[in-house]
Amino acid sequence: MTTIAKILAREILDSRGNPTLEAEVTLDDGSFGRAAVPSGASTGTKEAVELRDGDKTRYLGKGVRHAVDNVNGTIAETLKNFDAADQQGLDRRLIDLDGTENKGRLGANALLGVSLAAAHAVAASRKQPLWQYLSTITESDVALPVPMMNIINGGAHADNNVDFQEFMVLPVGCSSFSEALRAGTEIFYSLKSVLKGHGLSTAVGDEGGFAPDFRSNVEALDTILEAIGKAGYTAGEDILLGLDVASSEFYDNGKYNLVGENKRLTSEQFVDFLADWVAQYPIISIEDGLAEDDWAGWKLLTDRVGKHVQLVGDDLFVTNPKIFKQGIDSGTANAILIKVNQIGTLTETLEAIAMAHAANYASIVSHRSGETEDTTIADIAVATTATQIKTGSLCRSDRVAKYNQLLRIEQALGSDARYAGRDAFVSIKR
């Protein structure tokens, strides 16, 4: 039976040393599921509420004991004897129990921990890996996603002078996920050597990418191209580039303030800036190219380069189906970043992915800068045919854990394993 017998939560630490919530669900048949909730550094203003204690004498106010108490009290009592196999019904019960639009009463971190742990428990009860169980919910084919490997960190993810938050390599020319992972790793090694050769720091940021100071943002791209070539790969063929601009972080009074470039640009000027980069470099994906409230700027960018580049809404859409629909209806962006803690339940996460695919938008399953050893997002990416995953660089075990889970899934699929590769960008004409 998949009836819930017990729910338990605790406070643990994430990869930045901040408290986060971990939940466990035990079923009547003894099956057990556990999930830990991630946390972001650069966050959209419309994200579901991550409930923090606010007690400055404890973890500088970042404790999550209130959220833990909500799980161990109200949520555990309400869901006892509920059938965890009814994921949609369980998540609806959680949403109704919270009763707020932004999940601010009980906390999205409380709801999400239980939602994900319940799915793990049902998968265990059915003696299925999580990805296989989730694929029965989504009724999707399965595929190994293209990893978007964040090898240079900037912005809110690093203490350097780089304005843009992430510079990524995408090994689209490989024949399997394992080969793609090898390519990314070899480029990461090569980049370290190149940075040392230029006398630059090889310290890493929150997501495991290198975080040196550069003379300009574009120097980061040039350095990555050098590393790709040194590793024996061809940029534009084997490897494409991706950016997370995270422009809401430097958008102020209607201008984009690029400290590293000593420029303050209007939306039109910043669109020109990004379009010039697209013309000069093998960039296939730009995330949060414009600020979350600059819908007019987003439309300009979409009209300018949207046929040639994947334009990903993260802060713009915050994995929220209601907000995402506005983007679809207005033809804004052409892809959505999927972060489970932005919306707060598994069901709503899967709904956002399904909505993207129905509208011919790409979906990218993503980690947060504050992560744990939890690997749930790897299974979600495979089970939904998301075709792309963002889970950081090639160091820090909180990032590598997801890559290792994808290796396990690829091995389990055997001859049925399919790597998305270039097919992930079939609608993009470069």
From Swiss-Prot:
Pfam family for this entry, one: Enolase_C
Reaction equation(s) it catalyzes: (2R)-2-phosphoglycerate = phosphoenolpyruvate + H2O
Major subcellular site: cytoplasm
Binding site for Mg(2+): D244, E287, D314
Any one Gene Ontology cellular component term annotated for this protein: phosphopyruvate hydratase complex
Protein residues bound to (2R)-2-phosphoglycerate: Q165, K339, R368, S369, K390
Lineage: superkingdom: Bacteria
Positions annotated as active site in the UniProt record: E207, K339
Pathway info: Carbohydrate degradation; glycolysis; pyruvate from D-glyceraldehyde 3-phosphate: step 4/5
Protein family (similarity comment): Belongs to the enolase family.
Subunit structure, as described in the record: Component of the RNA degradosome, a multiprotein complex involved in RNA processing and mRNA degradation.
Protein name, per record: Enolase
Origin organism lineage: Bacteria, Pseudomonadati, Pseudomonadota, Gammaproteobacteria, Lysobacterales
